[in-house]
Amino acid sequence: DPYTGKLIHFVRGVKTSMAVQIDHVVALSNAWGTGAQKISDTSRYQLANDPLNLLAVDGPTNASKSDKDASQFLPRAAYRCKYVARQLAVKRKYKLWVTSSEKSSMVRVLNTCPKQNLP
Protein backbone atom coordinates (compact mmCIF):
# COMPACT_ATOMS: atom_id res chain seq x y z
CA ASP A 1 0.00 0.00 0.00
CA PRO A 2 1.58 3.30 -1.02
CA TYR A 3 -0.18 5.25 1.74
CA THR A 4 1.04 3.13 4.66
CA GLY A 5 3.89 1.08 3.21
CA LYS A 6 2.21 -2.09 4.51
CA LEU A 7 2.14 -5.27 2.47
CA ILE A 8 -1.48 -6.36 2.15
CA HIS A 9 -2.09 -10.07 1.69
CA PHE A 10 -5.26 -9.94 -0.35
CA VAL A 11 -7.40 -12.87 -1.41
CA ARG A 12 -10.66 -12.13 -3.16
CA GLY A 13 -13.61 -12.88 -0.93
CA VAL A 14 -16.08 -11.61 1.61
CA LYS A 15 -13.65 -11.69 4.53
CA THR A 16 -10.96 -9.65 2.76
CA SER A 17 -12.89 -7.40 0.39
CA MET A 18 -12.38 -4.35 2.60
CA ALA A 19 -8.62 -4.91 2.91
CA VAL A 20 -8.00 -3.13 -0.39
CA GLN A 21 -10.07 -0.24 -1.71
CA ILE A 22 -9.77 2.00 -4.74
CA ASP A 23 -9.14 5.56 -3.62
CA HIS A 24 -9.91 8.69 -5.60
CA VAL A 25 -6.62 10.51 -5.05
CA VAL A 26 -8.57 13.76 -5.44
CA ALA A 27 -11.75 12.88 -3.60
CA LEU A 28 -14.85 13.48 -5.68
CA SER A 29 -16.39 15.78 -3.08
CA ASN A 30 -13.15 17.78 -2.98
CA ALA A 31 -13.19 17.93 -6.78
CA TRP A 32 -16.79 19.16 -6.73
CA GLY A 33 -15.93 21.91 -4.27
CA THR A 34 -12.90 23.02 -6.28
CA GLY A 35 -14.37 23.31 -9.74
CA ALA A 36 -15.88 20.01 -10.90
CA GLN A 37 -19.36 21.49 -10.60
CA LYS A 38 -18.39 23.70 -13.57
CA ILE A 39 -17.12 20.98 -15.89
CA SER A 40 -19.25 18.84 -18.19
CA ASP A 41 -20.92 15.61 -17.11
CA THR A 42 -18.56 13.78 -19.46
CA SER A 43 -15.52 15.36 -17.81
CA ARG A 44 -16.85 14.51 -14.33
CA TYR A 45 -17.34 10.89 -15.45
CA GLN A 46 -13.78 10.85 -16.77
CA LEU A 47 -12.46 12.33 -13.52
CA ALA A 48 -14.23 9.66 -11.47
CA ASN A 49 -12.81 6.86 -13.62
CA ASP A 50 -9.40 8.22 -14.63
CA PRO A 51 -6.56 5.83 -13.68
CA LEU A 52 -4.52 8.92 -12.77
CA ASN A 53 -7.05 9.58 -10.00
CA LEU A 54 -7.49 5.95 -8.90
CA LEU A 55 -5.17 4.07 -6.58
CA ALA A 56 -5.50 0.70 -4.83
CA VAL A 57 -4.82 1.31 -1.14
CA ASP A 58 -5.31 -0.10 2.35
CA GLY A 59 -9.05 -0.10 3.04
CA PRO A 60 -9.02 1.29 6.59
CA THR A 61 -6.60 4.05 5.56
CA ASN A 62 -8.83 4.96 2.62
CA ALA A 63 -11.83 5.10 4.94
CA SER A 64 -9.88 7.39 7.27
CA LYS A 65 -8.78 9.61 4.36
CA SER A 66 -12.36 9.83 3.14
CA ASP A 67 -12.82 13.11 1.27
CA LYS A 68 -9.93 14.96 2.92
CA ASP A 69 -7.61 17.17 0.91
CA ALA A 70 -3.83 17.48 1.30
CA SER A 71 -4.21 19.86 4.24
CA GLN A 72 -6.12 17.19 6.17
CA PHE A 73 -4.52 13.95 4.98
CA LEU A 74 -1.06 13.01 3.80
CA PRO A 75 0.27 9.48 3.41
CA ARG A 76 3.53 8.28 4.94
CA ALA A 77 6.51 10.55 4.29
CA ALA A 78 8.09 8.26 1.67
CA TYR A 79 5.03 8.63 -0.61
CA ARG A 80 4.01 12.24 0.05
CA CYS A 81 5.82 13.82 -2.89
CA LYS A 82 4.32 11.40 -5.39
CA TYR A 83 0.89 11.75 -3.78
CA VAL A 84 0.87 15.55 -3.91
CA ALA A 85 2.25 15.54 -7.46
CA ARG A 86 -0.50 13.15 -8.49
CA GLN A 87 -3.16 15.33 -6.86
CA LEU A 88 -1.81 18.36 -8.70
CA ALA A 89 -1.75 16.47 -12.00
CA VAL A 90 -5.41 15.49 -11.56
CA LYS A 91 -6.40 19.02 -10.58
CA ARG A 92 -4.54 20.46 -13.57
CA LYS A 93 -6.02 17.95 -16.00
CA TYR A 94 -9.60 18.72 -14.92
CA LYS A 95 -9.07 22.45 -14.28
CA LEU A 96 -9.77 22.20 -10.55
CA TRP A 97 -8.35 24.69 -8.11
CA VAL A 98 -6.49 24.31 -4.84
CA THR A 99 -7.66 25.91 -1.59
CA SER A 100 -5.24 28.09 0.37
CA SER A 101 -4.83 25.49 3.14
CA GLU A 102 -4.31 22.77 0.55
CA LYS A 103 -1.72 24.90 -1.23
CA SER A 104 0.21 25.51 2.00
CA SER A 105 0.38 21.79 2.69
CA MET A 106 1.33 20.95 -0.91
CA VAL A 107 4.08 23.58 -1.00
CA ARG A 108 5.48 22.30 2.31
CA VAL A 109 5.61 18.75 0.90
CA LEU A 110 7.00 19.70 -2.51
CA ASN A 111 9.76 21.82 -0.93
CA THR A 112 11.19 18.51 0.33
CA CYS A 113 11.38 17.07 -3.19
CA PRO A 114 12.10 19.84 -5.71
CA LYS A 115 12.80 17.35 -8.52
CA GLN A 116 9.42 15.62 -8.22
CA ASN A 117 7.67 15.59 -11.60
CA LEU A 118 3.95 15.42 -12.18
CA PRO A 119 2.83 12.05 -13.52
Show where each model-derived region lies.
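Betabetaalpha-Me/HNH-type nuclease active-site subdomain
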Residues: 1-57, 62-66
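C-terminal, well-folded lobe of enzymatic/effector domains
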Residues: 64-119
